């Protein structure tokens, strides 16, 4: 089984959406892969559950999230050695955070370009994220 880790800043919006989307698509397309998600700076956020715009978009896509009520998780609190691929949602935002985290220095990390709110509306960023996740699932199929 292939394991993917999606990473964003607070683990409440982009990475959680990507995780739920990926797992749903893999299940419906019978792809032997699974995803989880974590954040690089979860302590900066008071709201620590999945962000409402992500839940709304998942509902629109008829995806029932499996972890919507779970708190966000910091990347240093999980064993990232079990993942075959680590994807940070926005290279411009996350590369400096990764570079400053000694825990992550030895890992090959891929960077996407899914920009966070308020710079980019969720109505733009989440469909873009869905497309990137769909492309990834197709590559694994």
What is the role of each PLM region?
Residues 1-77:
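Conserved active-site segments centered on acidic
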Residues 12, 91-94:
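Short glycine-rich anion-binding loops that position phosphate/pyrophosphate groups of nucleotides
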Residues 22, 30, 51-53, 93, ...:
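Generic alpha-helical propensity signal that fires on short helical segments
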Residues 40, 91, 114:
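Active-site loop/turn elements of alpha/beta-hydrolase fold enzymes
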Residues 80:
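A conserved, positively charged/aromatic
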Residues 83:
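An anion/phosphate-binding loop that grips the pyrophosphate of nucleotide cofactors and donors
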Residues 94-141:
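Phosphate-binding/catalytic loops
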């Amino acid at each position: 089984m292939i394991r993917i880790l999606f990473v964003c800043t607070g683990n409440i919006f982009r990475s959680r959406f990507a995780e739920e989307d990926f797992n749903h698509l893999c299940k419906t397309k019978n792809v032997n892969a699974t995803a989880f998600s974590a954040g690089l700076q979860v302590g900066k956020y008071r709201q620590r559950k999945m962000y409402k715009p992500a839940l709304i978009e998942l509902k629109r896509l008829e995806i029932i999230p499996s972890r919507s009520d779970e708190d966000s998780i910091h990347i240093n609190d999980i064993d990232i050695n079990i993942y075959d691929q680590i994807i940070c949602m926005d290279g411009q935002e996350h590369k400096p955070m990764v570079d400053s985290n000694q825990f992550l220095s030895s890992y090959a990390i891929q960077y996407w370009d899914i920009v966070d709110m308020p710079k980019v509306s969720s109505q733009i960023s989440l469909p873009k994220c869905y497309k990137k996740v769909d492309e990834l699932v197709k590559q694994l199929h």
